[in-house]
Amino acid sequence: KCRLVIDFDFKYKEKLVNRQYDEDVIQKFITHIFSKISELYILSDEKKVCFVMEKGSFVDAPQKGYESKDGLHFLFPHIIAEKDTYKVLRKALLDLDIEKICKDAGFTPPSNDIEGIIDEAIYKGGNWFVYGGGKPTEQDKYKLTRIYKETNSGLMPLPIKLWIDNPLEIMKLNSVSNHSELSVDYTDKLQNGLKKKTLKQSISTESIDSMELNPHVLNKAMKYDIDI
């Protein structure tokens, strides 16, 4: 069991001059992800939070046949579930029409297909870099740039300064290390999509995060969410 992290890898056959997405595109991605999450997991409103991590810019692609690459990391810090369920979620996300979203916004869509864009390796024991880390060949690292909370009226941006000022807390949230308990329940649809039907009891996000995170940072962040 670990926190939900979704990795989008964009590869382009063209040599990019500008980044080929903006905040509106990111929000469309997140809205789609949350729609799939709601089909598979039962979670309270306060757990519907997404941290977005980006590099400062796109980079040259080392892969043959591509000129540029970019990416987005989506962290859902209050969703802790079994890794097998994330494979089901990833499969559900494959209907995301990234090409249309990008074209409608006036951007060049990635050249790799959706199977290649939504990385599955992290759910199969693949490597996942700690916050602020990255490949030794790349100087630019993924950093927290946005936080969104899903509400009945859509996505609401939350301030990131509290977390930026406490990078160690982001590192803890960004960990995909094993946890002993779940923080969500599974819908019938998800249970039917799993080969393994044995489910664990969920516990609240508050008790999980309180054990791991700095209480001062956690309490301030949760208070802000409630006030909003």
Task: Please describe what each predicted stretch is.
Residues K1-L72, F76-P109, W128, G134, ...:
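Signature for HUH/AEP ssDNA processing cores
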Residues S44-K48, E115-A121:
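Extended, compositionally biased
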Residues S68, A121-K124:
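A short, structural micro-pattern
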Residues S111-D113:
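Intrinsically disordered, low-complexity acidic Ser/Thr-rich regulatory segments
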